[in-house]
């Protein structure tokens, strides 16, 4: 593998994981805060809010996992090498 391609792959993998985790991390924090606020205002809706929150958090976490998969492909199964 060319050293330039290897260096670019490592940098791209780092960016995929780093930038892929920023958005979902902020979104998960905001969603959790809003869920706590909603439960505090309306305790009888706790079950519905919690279920919706867990589903939403799973969808947000999948974006981070996609970034990790792209990084692993770039590092170990690089199509450009």
UniProtKB/Swiss-Prot annotation:
A Pfam short name: ATP-synt_C
Annotated localization: Cellular thylakoid membrane
Listed PROSITE patterns: ATPASE_C (PS00605)
Transmembrane segments: 6-26, 57-77
Recorded topology in the membrane: Multi-pass membrane protein
Keywords: ATP synthesis, CF(0), Hydrogen ion transport, Ion transport, Lipid-binding, Membrane, Thylakoid, Transmembrane, Transmembrane helix, Transport
GO biological process terms, semicolon-separated: proton motive force-driven ATP synthesis
GO cellular component labels: plasma membrane-derived thylakoid membrane; proton-transporting ATP synthase complex; proton-transporting two-sector ATPase complex, proton-transporting domain
UniProt keyword Hydrolase present: no
UniProt-annotated site: Reversibly protonated during proton transport, residues: 61
InterPro entries: ATP_synth_csu_bac/chlpt, ATP_synth_F0_csu, ATP_synth_F0_csu_DDCD_BS, ATP_synth_F0_csu_sf, ATPase_proteolipid_c-like_dom, F/V-ATP_Csub_sf
Recorded GO MF terms: lipid binding; proton-transporting ATP synthase activity, rotational mechanism
Gene3D superfamilies in alphabetical order: F1F0 ATP synthase subunit C (1.20.20.10)
Family: Belongs to the ATPase C chain family.
NCBIfam families: ATP_synt_c, PRK07354.1
Subunit-level organization: F-type ATPases have 2 components, F(1) - the catalytic core - and F(0) - the membrane proton channel. F(1) has five subunits: alpha(3), beta(3), gamma(1), delta(1), epsilon(1). F(0) has four main subunits: a(1), b(1), b'(1) and c(10-14). The alpha and beta chains form an alternating ring which encloses part of the gamma chain. F(1) is attached to F(0) by a central stalk formed by the gamma and epsilon chains, while a peripheral stalk is formed by the delta, b and b' chains.
Function per UniProt: F(1)F(0) ATP synthase produces ATP from ADP in the presence of a proton or sodium gradient. F-type ATPases consist of two structural domains, F(1) containing the extramembraneous catalytic core and F(0) containing the membrane proton channel, linked together by a central stalk and a peripheral stalk. During catalysis, ATP synthesis in the catalytic domain of F(1) is coupled via a rotary mechanism of the central stalk subunits to proton translocation.
Protein name: ATP synthase subunit c
Gene (name only): atpE
